[in-house]
């Protein structure tokens, strides 16, 4: 098998990698009603690529979530809660209560930091 054969083999492997997937779905803790001690693990449906844990007062929500919806506005709207803390993650069974209790940061805090940093850098460079 020369260079051309190697290219064909590489092309076939690439096509297989694109069209085949492991079939593994994300596992999250998910309970139908808010509870502080959710231990029910579920395989998330297709399209749900994140786990969410949310604390609103004494209510704790655990569920599969779309990572693109991991914003404060989306979470408050979908859960119909006005004040809450939340944590989105993309690893199996990562939405445990300790994420919030140990100071897990919300996506919105990280986003604000990422948005503010360039403005601070620009202001610093303009300062005489």
Curated annotation (Swiss-Prot):
**Which InterPro entries would you find in this protein's record?**
CD59 (IPR056949), CD59_antigen_CS (IPR018363), LY6_UPA_recep-like (IPR016054), Snake_toxin-like_sf (IPR045860)
Domain UPAR/Ly6: where?
26-108
Annotated membrane topology: Lipid-anchor; GPI-anchor
PANTHER family to which the protein is assigned, alphabetical: CD59 GLYCOPROTEIN
What are the boundaries of the signal sequence? 1-25
Subcellular localization is given as: Cell membrane; Secreted
Q: How is it modified after translation?
A: N- and O-glycosylated.
Q: Which UniProt keywords apply?
A: Cell membrane, Disulfide bond, Glycoprotein, GPI-anchor, Lipoprotein, Membrane, Secreted, Signal
Q: List the disulfide bonds.
A: 28-51, 31-38, 44-64, 70-88, 89-94
Where does the UniProt entry say this protein principally localizes?
membrane
Q: Which gene encodes it?
A: CD59
Functional note: Potent inhibitor of the complement membrane attack complex (MAC) action, which protects self-cells from damage during complement activation. Acts by binding to the beta-haipins of C8 (C8A and C8B) components of the assembling MAC, forming an intermolecular beta-sheet that prevents incorporation of the multiple copies of C9 required for complete formation of the osmolytic pore.
Q: What is this protein called?
A: CD59 glycoprotein
Subunit comment: Interacts with T-cell surface antigen CD2.
GPI-anchor amidated asparagine lipid sites: 102
